[in-house]
Design a protein with these regions (language model features):
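Short, mixed-charge, low-aromatic patches
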Residues: 15-24, 88-96
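N-terminal beta1-alpha1 ligand-phosphate binding loop
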Residues: 1-21, 27-31
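A structural preference for short, hydrophobic beta-strand core positions in alpha/beta folds
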Residues: 25-26, 149
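Flexible, gly/pro- and Lys/Arg-enriched active-site loops
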Residues: 35-44, 54-60, 64-150
């Protein structure tokens, strides 16, 4: 997986270079316990806030291209170790559910490794489907995930 912090910094820079995308917020970095597959190293996680005119599907395609072209990601083990994983959590108030994209991200409200860094940059942001703020979702979360600010 290489230098996890450097990978996050490179990913932030790559996303910031996308046309019609401006990084307007970056959470602190967190070291988090793996979810879904046991026996693997911890992950580093962060959340970016973007201002973009790109439609959701096009933004997702560009994020996936960064994963493959810059970080040589090949998808083998679901939830397995990888150098970088760029997820699109929200796109304004968009609600999408198709073969390629689900917005809001279907498991974001269940994951401390998503909610904690999201809380750091937009605690009052409301989940478009649940109608609850990030702060409310985080306070209600019952999870044994370890999430440590680095």
């Amino acid at each position: 997986m290489g230098d996890r912090e450097l990978n996050l910094l490179r990913a932030v820079a790559e996303v910031g270079r996308l046309p019609d995308c401006k990084v307007t917020g970056l959470s602190p970095f967190y070291e988090t316990s793996p979810v879904g597959v046991a026996g693997q190293p911890s992950f580093y996680n962060a959340v970016l806030r973007l201002h973009t005119s790109l439609p959701p599907h096009e933004l997702l395609e560009r994020l996936l291209r960064i994963e493959t072209d810059v970080f040589s990601r090949t998808r083998t083990t679901h939830w397995g170790p990888r150098r970088i994983d760029l997820d699109l959590l929200l796109h304004g108030e968009a609600i999408i559910s198709d073969d390629r994209l689900k917005l809001p991200h279907p498991r974001m409200a269940e994951r401390r490794f998503v909610l904690q860094p999201l809380y750091d940059i937009v605690p009052d942001l409301r989940h478009p489907l649940l109608g609850r703020s990030v702060a409310e979702l985080l306070a209600a979360l019952r999870s044994d995930e370890t999430v440590t600010r680095i």
